[in-house]
């Protein structure tokens, strides 16, 4: 197989503020695998300060992946090796790269079999689900206005970021969102900003405002404290940063109400399926989340949405210009494509300084704006990359 990669800059439509930082852009690296018949499979990984992945690191890891993938005759054997625990083009300790390699292989395997990914995974029809739409830390007036616009567009689930220095700001923000969109389901995400004492004081107030569940209220690193809080909380508690991989989830199964599975965090589609299987019958339910990424980066998770209680796959909707299309979302619902593979396509962009990206199996080429280099912590600082 032939393997190529491209690095692009993904700019957000507006800066996204969470509890400790603000993000306005990030880099993405696209991996493309090509078979002997000229068909292409694509995967994406994005930079993340929290996971220690800057642009240089991702490019180096993808270069290593290209060398390793070259030893496989076809994507089917590479995917089988990857699912069996072999590196198969991705260092086992870097879940985001493993996820991107797995996505590219699944995309190509699906195209070779003329089958969408969800059918390869056992779902006969294309999964669809309501996705949450994120509202960052902002003034109550702006949050309320945004909630009103989103509800009018069809969004029935809104996720409000919390963790402002003054907790009353969080309460007033949620109050404004609830008043502006009284019928939507509300999720709350402090990104680990609270102490146990603050969480215990605030959660009853958010319950009174009709919040459905709270993600990772406590700082990660003490899953026992999170589990203990979940037992006392008037709201369901969903573990995120404390539920990275399968072993983390097994320790929390039955002790928290949900786990937020992000493919870049756990290692891809098949790792997510193992996590979903591990919590069956435990009382802990699945949430599918994402980093801010393009439709290419989110597409693998969209093929799994029929397995989740909560779906938060709006990362592509936060971009100023999503360079891929094919999973929907603008009306509040994401839907897996029925086209072979991941089912996403490059949007036709043209302009100065753009880099060619191998396109669909018909041999056409798409383009993507070339990145200016690593973010270097300038725009992606602190923990904004958890959004």
Locate the predicted segments by residue:
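N-terminal amphipathic alpha-helix/helix-capping segment at the start of soluble metabolic enzymes
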Residues: 1-3, 7, 18-23, 110-111, ...
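Flexible C-terminal active-site loop/helix
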Residues: 1-3, 7-12, 23, 291-366, ...
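Structured beta-strand/loop patches that form or line metal/cofactor-binding pockets in enzymes
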Residues: 1-51, 320, 324
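Metal- or metallocofactor-binding catalytic centers and their adjacent structured scaffolds
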Residues: 5-7, 34-112
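Conserved, mostly hydrophobic/aromatic
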Residues: 31, 38, 101, 114, ...
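A cross-domain feature marking catalytic cores of carbohydrate-active enzymes
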Residues: 45, 133-135, 160-162, 188-192, ...
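Metal-dependent enolase-superfamily TIM-barrel catalytic cores that perform enediolate-based chemistry
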Residues: 119-233
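Shared catalytic-loop signature of beta/alpha-barrel
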Residues: 222-228, 232-236, 243-337
